[in-house]
A protein has these predicted regions:
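Short Gly/Pro-enriched turn/cap motifs at secondary-structure boundaries
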Residues: 167, 182-185, 209-212, 228-229, ...
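A short core secondary-structure module
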Residues: 191, 200, 204-249
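Amphipathic, small/basic residue-rich leader segments at the start of a protein or domain
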Residues: 19-27, 33-141, 158-162, 166-169
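A glycine-rich, basic-preceded beta-loop-alpha segment at the flavin cofactor/substrate interface
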Residues: 42-44, 121, 242-252, 262-278
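Buried hydrophobic positions in well-ordered alpha/beta secondary-structure cores of metabolic enzymes
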Residues: 62, 73, 102, 109, ...
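N-terminal glycine-rich flavin-associated loop
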Residues: 138-158, 184
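A short, Trp-centered hydrophobic/proline-enriched beta-strand micro-motif
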Residues: 170-178
């Protein structure tokens, strides 16, 4: 007979026998430590370090990805995290290190510079980075998910060819601009506007609490489109690039958490976004 969690009736009986024996021994004045050293106990079926037996469900390739990510994180990130957290110090070379190992944009196809892994592998990478610090995981996951995935899923072929390979290597750093200072992450209340003009859009607005923005080269931002007639249309995504006139990204200092990763604003003061980046 087996219980639903895999524990046999014999193991349960052994546990109960031991429990009642301990109570009897305590009544006789036998020290607790002496009792447990001399009494065999049933082996626990629960594995605290893998409670859902995840490892048994992984493929060999997924285990290899996990182990490679774990080795890098423990060796390279673990050595940096205390200094980074204490002093709000972000090291941009981390992106290039991760890129060299294929840890950025894991699900991006090989033709655009990614390793073409599945989402299980991506989750395993994120978990290993998170073991060290949420700030480092934020750096990696913003680049991999919020920046690279929208470009890969919804961008033009030219946009994919231009942005994804350099984001995958970490040569370029990306950020994702949705949250605003007065409206949080509520898209319906979004105040940022993209005014249609000849050859592109004029971007006006502010984003807040944006991971990676002060060191970013690529800005995936969201705005409500305004037609040339003045009608406010749907929300659209735009890809802005470092150096565009009117684009700035001041840093936010004094955070309580995520101190190992840099956070900032995105300020768009009549930034011209060409049609090919919309």
């Amino acid at each position: 007979f087996m219980w639903s969690d895999g524990v046999s009736i014999n193991e349960v009986s052994s546990y109960l026998d031991a429990k009642f024996s301990f109570a009897a021994a305590a009544g006789r004045g036998v020290p607790c430590g002496q009792f447990f050293r001399s009494t065999p106990m049933a082996k626990a079926a629960f594995q605290w370090n893998d409670p859902f037996l995840l490892d048994q469900q992984l493929s060999d390739d997924e285990r290899m990805v996990r182990d490679a990510a774990a080795a890098y994180c423990q060796d390279r990130l673990g050595a940096r995290v205390l200094e980074a957290f204490r002093h709000e110090k972000t090291d941009p070379t981390i992106f290039r290190e991760m890129g060299a190992l294929g840890l950025l944009g894991p699900t991006i196809p090989e033709q655009y510079g990614g390793p073409g892994l599945n989402y299980v592998a991506y989750g395993l990478i994120a978990r290993e980075v998170e073991r060290i610090d949420s700030g480092y995981r934020s750096m990696m996951s913003v680049q991999s998910s919020l920046v690279m995935v929208p470009i890969n899923e919804f961008g033009s072929e030219a946009q994919k060819q231009k942005f994804l390979p350099k984001l995958a290597t970490g040569e370029w750093i990306g950020c994702f601009g949705l949250t605003e200072p007065d409206h949080g992450s509520d898209p319906n209340s979004m105040a940022t506007r993209a005014y249609k003009t000849a050859g592109g859009y004029r971007m006006v607005g502010n984003k807040m609490w944006i991971s990676n923005s002060p060191i970013a080269d690529v800005f995936v931002v969201w705005a409500k489109e305004v037609s040339e007639s003045g009608a406010v249309g749907p929300i659209r995504g735009f890809v802005l690039e470092k150096g565009m006139k009117g684009l700035s990204a001041p840093a936010v200092h004094g955070k309580v958490g995520l101190r190992a990763s840099i956070t900032g604003e995105i300020v768009m003061d009549n930034v011209f976004c060409p049609e090919e980046n919309a």
